[in-house]
């Protein structure tokens, strides 16, 4: 299944706010209308919608998300929390959380087009897994820095999560540590996502 490229507002009306997909928000009251129409949601549908929320927010294909679930299942600790850590530490998501891109698809384009360096080397793989002490910088070229500066100026000022530091004037971000669960940028019940996949096997 390919990455979603359809109408974004349609997704947030059904699933709620997906800040990684779009900066738009559902209209006030739309959640209530959706709830009134779906009072008798099956447990399967509830799990499916949580899985879809995760997939669309981080901009993943079904195959990519399944791969992350399997990796998380083999790691120590809570599968759900490890899954969120894996997704949050992707390079495209780190750029988004730093405010260098307005959405994760936009961050992915920056990476794909070679505008981003990690520890002094160009990384053009959006799924690159960042680690503590990684330094993310914008390429020292005018078009790259102008592009990111425009995005920084356009992004709504938000408090950075504890695991990241941004040095705006140096066009530099620092990964301080692995993200805490409380700092995840999406309202999600990750246990339902794990349950969804465990029932598919």
UniProtKB/Swiss-Prot annotation:
Single GO MF descriptor: structural constituent of ribosome
Subcellular localization(s) per the UniProt record: Plastid, Chloroplast
PROSITE patterns: RIBOSOMAL_S4, S4
Family of this protein: Belongs to the universal ribosomal protein uS4 family.
GO cellular component terms given for this protein: chloroplast; small ribosomal subunit
Subunit structure: Part of the 30S ribosomal subunit. Contacts protein S5. The interaction surface between S4 and S5 is involved in control of translational fidelity.
Source species: Capsella bursa-pastoris (Shepherd's purse)
Family annotation (Pfam families): Ribosomal_S4 (PF00163), S4 (PF01479)
This protein's record includes keyword Ribonucleoprotein: yes
Keywords for the protein's UniProt record, in alphabetical order: Chloroplast, Plastid, Ribonucleoprotein, Ribosomal protein, RNA-binding, rRNA-binding
Listed name of the protein: Small ribosomal subunit protein uS4c
Coiled coil: none
Residue ranges of domain S4 RNA-binding in the record: 89-152
GO biological process, one term: ribosomal small subunit biogenesis
Segments traversing the membrane: none
Function, as annotated: One of the primary rRNA binding proteins, it binds directly to 16S rRNA where it nucleates assembly of the body of the 30S subunit.
InterPro entries found in the cross-reference section: Ribosomal_uS4 (IPR022801), Ribosomal_uS4_bac-type (IPR005709), Ribosomal_uS4_CS (IPR018079), Ribosomal_uS4_N (IPR001912), S4_RNA-bd (IPR002942), S4_RNA-bd_sf (IPR036986)
UniProt keyword tRNA processing, yes or no: no
């Amino acid at each position: 299944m390919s990455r979603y490229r359809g109408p974004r507002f349609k997704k947030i009306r059904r699933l709620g706010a997906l800040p990684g997909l779009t900066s738009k928000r559902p209209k006030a009251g739309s959640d209530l209308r959706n709830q009134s129409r779906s009072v008798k949601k099956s447990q399967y549908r509830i799990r499916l919608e949580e899985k879809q929320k995760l997939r669309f927010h981080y901009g993943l294909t079904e195959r990519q998300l399944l791969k992350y679930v399997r990796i998380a299942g083999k790691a120590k600790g809570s599968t759900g929390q490890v899954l969120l850590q894996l997704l949050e530490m992707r390079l495209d998501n780190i750029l988004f959380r730093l405010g260098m891109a307005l959405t994760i698809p936009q961050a992915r384009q920056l990476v794909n087009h070679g505008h981003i360096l990690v520890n002094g080397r160009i990384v053009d793989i959006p799924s690159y897994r960042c680690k503590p002490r990684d330094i993310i910088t914008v390429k020292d070229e005018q078009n790259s820095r102008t592009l990111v500066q425009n995005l920084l100026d356009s992004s709504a000022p938000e408090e950075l999560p504890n695991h990241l530091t941004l040095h705006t004037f140096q066009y530099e971000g620092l990964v301080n540590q692995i993200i805490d669960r409380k700092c995840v940028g999406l309202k999600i019940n990750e246990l339902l996502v794990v349950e969804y996949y465990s029932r598919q096997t």
